[in-house]
From Swiss-Prot:
Family matches, as SMART domains: Ribosomal_S15
Subunit record text: Part of the 30S ribosomal subunit. Forms a bridge to the 50S subunit in the 70S ribosome, contacting the 23S rRNA.
Species of provenance: Rippkaea orientalis (strain PCC 8801 / RF-1)
Protein name: Small ribosomal subunit protein uS15
Keyword RNA-binding on entry: yes
InterPro entries to which the protein is assigned, alphabetical: Ribosomal_uS15, Ribosomal_uS15_bac-type, uS15_NS1_RNA-bd_sf
GO MF annotations, alphabetized: rRNA binding; structural constituent of ribosome
Keyword terms: Ribonucleoprotein, Ribosomal protein, RNA-binding, rRNA-binding
GO cellular-component term (any): cytosolic small ribosomal subunit
Family membership: Belongs to the universal ribosomal protein uS15 family.
Record's function text: One of the primary rRNA binding proteins, it binds directly to 16S rRNA where it helps nucleate assembly of the platform of the 30S subunit by binding and bridging several RNA helices of the 16S rRNA.
Pfam families, alphabetized: Ribosomal_S15
UniProt keyword Glycosyltransferase, yes or no: no
GO biological process: translation
Length: 89
């Protein structure tokens, strides 16, 4: 369950910090959030897909660590990102 190239590019252009940004923590969190939402839909239709569930939990953990890093560096940027992505934490 990966993102298509057009979906990924849309997320990159809307969340990049500067013009050539392709891997900032904010952008990584946005990409992970998009993948997590897709995988959540897949798991609702396929509840016995345990391999995908494990991948989902790993992505959630990675996103949580990135969000903790952003919060430790700049809490206002963290709050803005959480609000913009619509995730609760």
């Amino acid at each position: 369950m990966s993102l298509s190239a057009t979906q990924k590019q849309e997320v990159i252009t809307s969340y990049q910090v500067h013009e050539t940004d392709t891997g900032s923590a904010d952008l990584q969190v946005a990409l992970l959030t998009t993948r997590i939402s897709q995988l959540t839909g897949h798991l609702q239709q396929n509840p016995k897909d345990h391999a995908s569930r494990r991948g989902l939990l790993k992505m959630i953990g990675r996103r949580r660590r990135l969000l903790s890093y952003i919060n430790s560096k700049d809490s206002q940027r963290y709050q803005d990102l959480i609000k913009r992505l619509g995730i609760r934490r």
